[in-house]
Every structure is written in structure tokens, then in C-alpha cells.
Regions:
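Short S/T/G/P-rich N-terminal loop/turn motif that feeds into the first structured element of a domain
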Residues: 2-230, 242, 257-261, 293-296
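Alpha-helical oligomerization segments
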Residues: 236-247, 252-296
Length: 296
């Protein structure tokens, strides 16, 4: 999220309904909301776009992956029960893109990256060290894009909504079962942040739309089908919202193969501004889809 998508090669869990940050306060601490929330831990996604995806690059990539994984728990086999036993935030997860790269994609283009790794830590400088080490090892043979995020406690407008969005939510499962990963960075428009916190919260609920004067589902009901099918997290910009040229959130999903159509249905429903007017204020970044793997 730093500088929208940071090019590392050129520069030295709280579940939600779908995770676009409707319930969060204002990131810069003005009268419409609260100050920047406490970052509990940090995460960084690295997207590797090989200049020549050949055997030589593959060997260097595997060696680099093994090196940066030292000292981290591998998330591939961590499920809900094991997460409670492990150092939850000192983790690493490797992923490989599903399908072919898009033929035409304006840069910087995350979907062009065949390989992605997510590293999480309570200590942000540790992630910068990983950034520098990865660039040192493969930066001459690949472009490396990165997104930063932070774990924060959920701040919904009611306990009822928390219960609604978590009651039937699935536990996290290992990568052998929940094989798919989907990432969607996004930002909210300035018009969104100009609204009061109370008005922003209302977009989560069924309500009467101000513009059409008709009843609409709102965010929660629009995303309802995804609650039992998708494991999800929202990562927040660690430096606050409304920062020029940066994303506010990264929505993160895991699911099995059978649930992929559910994700597509949910994102389509959320994009339908006739039922979810909140999406009028959402600017989506490039979506990345891949498979969780034990190692590169």
C-alpha cells in the first residue's frame, strides 16, 4: 500500500463481511472520525515479475525463498487451532499465480507476477529487511512489487454486526484444503471520508438510499453468501487512510476450489451500486489470484 504499489527492485485477523473498511474511522483524525488506530502487527506482500521465467531464475527464486523463510512459521499448514499455538504474526506464506498473465495490463500490474510471498511480523523493520534481502538476491532478474498492510482490531458500529459476520464464518484451514488466495487492494474516495462516521456505518446495513430513495441491501447483505465460504482478513494502510497515491486497505481471501464461484458472486454483488451504494466510493486496485504452496 506504500506509494500504491512499491517497486522493490527500483527503491532502496480480524474477519469482516467482505472487507472494504466501511466501519473504520477517519485515518487522519479529523472531525469525521477518530485518529489512526493502533497497528497490532504488520504484513507485506511481495509480487515477483520475472524478466525471464527460466530454470535459472527458478533456482534463484527457490534459494531466495528458502533464505527469507528462516525464522518464520510457514502459513501453509497453519489452521485455526495451530494459529493459537504459534507466534501468529511471525509467519510467511508462498503463493503461485493461477492461470496465465493478462496480455494487456497497465503497470504496475500485480497479475503479471507469477510468484507472491506474504511475510508478517510484529516488527515493521523486520519486513524491510526481508524486502532488501529479496531484492539483493533476485532484483537483477525480476521486478518486485510490494504492498504493505497492518493488522488492527475490528471497529464495527455494533456488536450485532460483528456477530453477524463471524457467527458462520469458517475457521482458517491449511493450504492443502483452502488452496486459493485472492488479494484486492482498494482505496475510498475523498467523498467517502468527508461523510460522518455514523453515515459511513449506515452503508453496512440495509437502508434507504439517499439518491434513489429506494431500499437497498447494503454491504453486509450484499456479501452474505461469502460469510460461510470465504476466510477473509482486512489489512489497513499502516500509516493511515487518505494518503496520496496509496491504498487504504487490502482485502485478503482464502477458499477451496468449490467456493471460488461464491467469491465471484459476492464481488459482483458488492459492485452492484443499486444494492450496495457504498461501492460508489470504492476505487479497486489490481486483483491477484493464486494458489497457496509450501514453497516456491
Amino acid at each position: 500500500m506504500h506509494k500504491v504499489i512499491q517497486s522493490a527492485s527500483s527503491e532502496t485477523d480480524s474477519p469482516s463481511v467482505m472487507g472494504s473498511g466501511c466501519g473504520e474511522g477517519h485515518g487522519n483524525g479529523n472531525a469525521n472520525g477518530s485518529s489512526v488506530a493502533t497497528n497490532l502487527a504488520f504484513t507485506k506482500f511481495f509480487f515477483v515479475i520475472a524478466r525471464a521465467d527460466d530454470d535459472a531464475h527458478g533456482a534463484r527464486l527457490r534459494a531466495a525463498g528458502g533464505n527469507i523463510a528462516r525464522g518464520f512459521f510457514n502459513d501453509f499448514d497453519i489452521d485455526d487451532a495451530r494459529e493459537l499455538q504459534a507466534q501468529r504474526f511471525e509467519t510467511i506464506q508462498f503463493c503461485v499465480r493461477e492461470g496465465d498473465a493478462p496480455a494487456d495490463c497497465p503497470g504496475p500490474c500485480l497479475p503479471q507476477a507469477r510468484h507472491m510471498v506474504q511475510v508478517s511480523s510484529k516488527y515493521r523493520p523486520r519486513l524491510q529487511e526481508i524486502d532488501e534481502e529479496l531484492r539483493r538476491r533476485i532484483g537483477d532478474s525480476a521486478e518486485i512489487l510490494s504492498l504493505e498492510g497492518a493488522f488492527r482490531n475490528p471497529r464495527y458500529s455494533s456488536a450485532e454486526l460483528v456477530q453477524y459476520s463471524t457467527r458462520n464464518a469458517p475457521p482458517r484451514r491449511s493450504g492443502r484444503l483452502s488452496k486459493n488466495v485472492i488479494l484486492l487492494p482498494m482505496r475510498k474516495t475523498s467523498e467517502w471520508w468527508e461523510k460522518s462516521a455514523l453515515e459511513r456505518h449506515s452503508y453496512f446495513y440495509p437502508h434507504v438510499d439517499h439518491n434513489s430513495a429506494t431500499p437497498v441491501k447494503g454491504h453486509a447483505l450484499a456479501a452474505e453468501k461469502g460469510i460461510p465460504a470465504l476466510f477473509r482478513r482486512v489489512y489497513h494502510n499502516p500509516d493511515g487512510y487518505e494518503r496520496a497515491g496509496e491504498f487504504d486497505f487490502v482485502s485478503y481471501f482464502e477458499c477451496d476450489d468449490e467456493s471460488l464461484p461464491v467469491f465471484d458472486q459476492v464481488i459482483s454483488s458488492l459492485r452492484d451500486v443499486r444494492q450496495n451504494p457504498e461501492w460508489c466510493y470504492v476505487q479497486e486496485g489490481p486483483m491477484w489470484r493464486g494458489r497457496r504452496v509450501l514453497r516456491w
